[in-house]
Amino acid sequence: MTLAVPRFLKPAGFAFLAGLASCLPAKAQEIRVPRLERPPVIDGSLAEWRTLAFTDGVWDIYRLRQSPWFDPERNRLTDHGNEPPPEEDLNARYYMGWDRDYLYFGAEVHDNVNDVTDPAHEDKRWYFKDCVAWFIEAPKDEVSESFGQGDNAFCFVIDPRKPKYGAWWRHGAPGKTYLEEPIPAAAVDYAVKLNPWGRSPGDFILEARVRMAPTLGKSDSAWHPPRVGDVYGVEIVHTDPDGGDYGGHFLLYGRGDDDATWGKMILTGPAKPVERKPQ
């Protein structure tokens, strides 16, 4: 039996539907972040937990170009002369975990230059320095906001001297947006280790933990102590000025400050290390 194609689905109709589909928002990236059964020591080595955390491998500009959130105006590297190949300019693995009190963040990064000098320094201008920031919405909702209630950015400047602005918190609160302040000292612990593999003075390992109650709980009263199955919003922003001003950016799982574009971070139970088969 042959079914007739309705007139509204003939070429003009197909074009209309294709155009309509292109206007629909892309499905949010989903990542599953395991609970850590033992709290790691924050010392600039991820050895205790890197195999038990969320990570999805190495990111460089070529991989980012294939991602659904890629925007060349935002995801970019900069050319200041005598640059290495793009994959050597910046590539990184990022790690996340959680327990009843903390979110844990890690990064293992190959970078050709460590640059934490801002020509027009302000404490809040982490994005003009080498920095890795985790944008977290907790709990995730369906409202499009830019650093409104429930939105947080935990930003770690890659400076082992740990200046007062080295662990920065951009966040919202009920009725307020873009609040800027250091992460409360009692709520954060982090370490930066430069040149950990003896390869380049720009390489680094970042390890950090942020206590959730005085940060996420302050940003949104709807936050509650974490449970398996909770859904947060997430984006990673890695800034890389390389001696310039604003410089390069990697954006993962999102398209910028609008939390409606951020990925879904699902809290799960503990993970097991990757198993190697005997044959």
Task: Tell where the protein language model's regions lie, with residue ranges.
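N-terminal secretory signal peptides that target proteins for export/translocation
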Residues: 1-9
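Glycine-centered signal
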Residues: 6, 23-25
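Bacterial N-terminal signal peptides
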Residues: 11-22
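Structural preference for beta-rich elements and adjacent junctions enriched in aromatics
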Residues: 27-279
